[in-house]
Amino acid sequence: MAEVTLLGIAQDGGRPQPLCQKPCCANVGLDERAFPTSMGIKFEDSSTHLFDATRNLGDQLNIWQENLPSHVWLTHAHFGHVDGLGLFGRETIGAKGIILHVSKQMQELIQATPQWAIMLEQGVFTLEVFATGEEISFESETIIPLLVPHRDELSDMHAFIIRGKEKSLLYLPDHDTWEETLSLYGCKLIREWFEKFNINAAFIDGTFWSQHELSGRSQEEVPHPPVSQTIAHLGSRLPSDAEVFFIHLNHTNPLYDKSSSAFKTVESMGWKIGVQGMKLNL
């Protein structure tokens, strides 16, 4: 069966976040660091698939304990999900022939960005373009990209469903609102959407706990459905529900603190917070 390793649980800036001197970052020890969200999967055919390429690529490959990924899948163009691409290049790893799976908009951005375009010329990456809803089949697994609404200044955003022999996993690190995402697929409830795509486990956007978490800037600039809202929509977990793990946590998110009321509320309702290095079998 396919083995999933969660390689990071933080929002794009990681934890601690650069220049943050608040208590949420100032007291974070080395063993408490959280890397930007990423995921690695080893398929039954021994191919290795990295989802999102962060600046902490080296640390995350050490967590994964695999050699270079044979495939890289990008959700979108926001920096925390792509700024590790350069580490595969001539100046660092010097990789060759990695298959880079992207949307059409992401393909156009990569080809128009000199530091990425030269990596195509050097053979570091070979581009494969996917379409939303397309089933991309491997020996025992299938990957399905799903378009979801999220700030699209540079490219669109895709979640991924990974279907193994026994389970299906949803990887949804970012989206704007549940209303927009569910509406796009003709659904009104989160459970309904999970059931529509036969999801057994999900890594989903947990960027903020509440709508009032950021100080000094409007949260409307960085829309994400707050975890408190998501669990209010879901209610307590039922035996038939998918396992849900919240990921992509902003450095301000109280879910990092296991003693917080937020953490205890999520756990008491049967949902979970992703753990860096955790594994799932599909």
Please place each PLM-identified region on the residue numbering:
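Residue-level marker for beta-strand->alpha-helix junctions and adjacent short loops that shape enzyme
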Residues: Q11, F79, Q107, W209, ...
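Cap/insert and terminal regions of metallo-dependent hydrolase folds
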Residues: S168, D176-G277
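Short glycine-/acidic-enriched loop or helix-start segments at secondary-structure transitions
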Residues: P16, Q60-N62, D83-L85, Q111-A112, ...
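Active-site neighborhood of divalent metal-dependent phosphoester bond hydrolases
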Residues: T92-G97, K104-V129, T252-P254
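Structural beta-sheet core signal
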Residues: V72, L100-V102, L170-Y171, F246
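Active-site metal-binding motif and surrounding structural segment of the metallo-beta-lactamase
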Residues: D45-H101, N200
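Core dinuclear metal-dependent hydrolase active-site scaffold
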Residues: M1-W64, V129-L189, M278-L282
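Residues at the starts of beta-strands that form the adenosine-phosphate
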Residues: E3, S47, G97-I99, T126, ...
